[in-house]
Amino acid sequence: VEHSYLKGIIMKVLIIFNREPYDMTDVSWNGLRLARTLLKNGHDIRIFLMNDAVDMARDVCKPPQGYDQDLVKMLKELIADGATVRVCGTCMARCGIHANQPYFDGAEKSTMQALSEWVIDSDKVLTS
């Protein structure tokens, strides 16, 4: 169902990911799918990775055997299509299975201050 009141409205949507990418649920995968759909519909998508979700911005993070989705690849595709991705700088050394591994190009090392500014400036804030 198409809602005419939504036509022409561009929203700034911030999605904050917290969970380990491959935690035996589809929470992160569905968050990335939502981001892709919103981006495709013309919205300004901002993604902030913190806690164990920072692994999603690391090339060393691979899908476990039997999992049919590559979340790192999905995140890179979102960046290539215009989504802005920031990753907690403090979490780089503290969080994830791959702590201290670098973030890939396009995933900007960021701060809590930058996240707080995004929260204030976004029309919608979602957490996953």
What is each residue range found by the language model?
Residues 54-57, 94-95:
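Short, active-site-adjacent cap segments at secondary-structure transitions
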Residues 35, 45-50, 85-89:
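Short internal beta-strands
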Residues 1-10:
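Short, Lys/Arg-enriched N-terminal segments with co-localized hydrophobic residues
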Residues 27-41, 47:
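Histidine-anchored nucleotide/phosphate-binding helix
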Residues 97-117, 121, 126:
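C-terminal structural segments of small proteins and small subunits
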Residues 63-92:
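A glycine-rich helix N-cap at a beta->alpha junction
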Residues 61-65, 102-105:
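Short glycine-enriched, charge-decorated loop/helix-capping segments at active-site entrances
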Residues 13-29, 57-62:
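Short, glycine-rich nucleotide/cofactor-binding loops
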